[in-house]
Amino acid sequence: MAFKQLFAAITVALSLTAANAAVVKEKRATCANGKTVGDASCCAWFDVLDDIQANMFHGGQCGAEAHESIRLVFHDSIAISPAMEAKGKFGGGGADGSIMIFDTIETAFHPNIGLDEVVAMQKPFVQKHGVTPGDFIAFAGAVALSNCPGAPQMNFFTGRKPATQPAPDGLVPEPFHTVDQIIARVNDAGEFDELELVWMLSAHSVAAVNDVDPTVQGLPFDSTPGIFDSQFFVETQFRGTLFPGSGGNQGEVESGMAGEIRIQTDHTLARDSRTACEWQSFVGNQSKLVDDFQFIFLALTQLGQDPNAMTDCSDVIPLSKPIPGNGPFSFFPPGKSHSDIEQACAETPFPSLVTLPGPATSVARIPPHKA
């Protein structure tokens, strides 16, 4: 379904839910564990939740397993092309789990390198609980985000049928693609515009890279990879000065902090006139970050699906955790200041931020998957 149609469907659904709640008591079902949901079919997902929190996310941590589960959502969902369909070619099924069903094919695609590990990690849970791969990928991604302090309250809908064929290669954006290429790709996938593209990249707030630089693993995109905040949007605007590893890798540019990786697409989107002001708008604005990402994540997980035929099981997703402490949502790390910013938005100045005290340090790597 095209994004604008999807937007209308989601908006109507949310409006009807609010209206119904104001008139009559919402119809609920009570599960065996005593928790209530809007639809009885959602009860089975509590067993899945308990299992993956204990045995995949190690007690609800926002670590490597969570980061890779979030990445898997995007790589599965974005693989859809109405433009190819219009030419009589199969354009992929979007959020249909094809990357897991046809993993030997799709994880070999260049932008999906490294995802074979998270697919292998998730497959046993799919088989154990008898859910579809598409539903599980969306569920695991939503739960993973709920484990990261500061993330939105995530939504989750079921009803994705198993993919019947693999998505074509070439539909997942690469770190070395131009801004024009990436905007065109997301516009084809769901009629997303350049602003909504920036919303998608909020996921890099809780992410790391294992395969851009072959000499080093677990390189985060910002200094707070375990927290869903706007530091990613601050630190990508620092003037690039160094590489965290070997350097000179395809799709990598110099970052502004030791131990932190910066991919070419993030660097150029932060500075392109079409996206720079939206990029900067998240700095110091946690509520905008949360609202926009909550919407775009749901939209992505419903690409290729009919939202009206899906079941809302958002009740199963844990409450998101608040950002710990009383510190600012955006800040300059120790040793950094406004003079390190490469101002790109021509409409408004870069926000005034505090610099945290202490000496400048290297950003720690993300530990690999736990056995």
Curated annotation (Swiss-Prot):
Annotated binding of Ca(2+) 2, by residue: 205, 222, 224, 227, 229
Main enzyme class: oxidoreductase
3-hydroxytryptophan, modified sites: 199
Keyword Nucleotide-binding listed: no
Annotated cofactor note: Binds 2 calcium ions per subunit. Binds 1 heme b (iron(II)-protoporphyrin IX) group per subunit.
Keyword Cell inner membrane listed: no
Glycosylation sites: 285
Residue numbers binding heme b: 204
Pfam annotation, one family: peroxidase
Disulfide cross-links: 31-43, 42-313, 62-148, 277-345
Signal peptide start and end residues: 1-21
EC number per UniProt: 1.11.1.14
Molecular function GO labels: diarylpropane peroxidase activity; heme binding; metal ion binding
Catalytic activity: 1-(3,4-dimethoxyphenyl)-2-(2-methoxyphenoxy)propane-1,3-diol + H2O2 = 3,4-dimethoxybenzaldehyde + guaiacol + glycolaldehyde + H2O; 2 (3,4-dimethoxyphenyl)methanol + H2O2 = 2 (3,4-dimethoxyphenyl)methanol radical + 2 H2O
Pathway, per record: Secondary metabolite metabolism; lignin degradation
GO biological process, one term: lignin catabolic process
Job of this protein: Depolymerization of lignin. Catalyzes the C(alpha)-C(beta) cleavage of the propyl side chains of lignin.
Annotated protein name in UniProt: Ligninase LG2
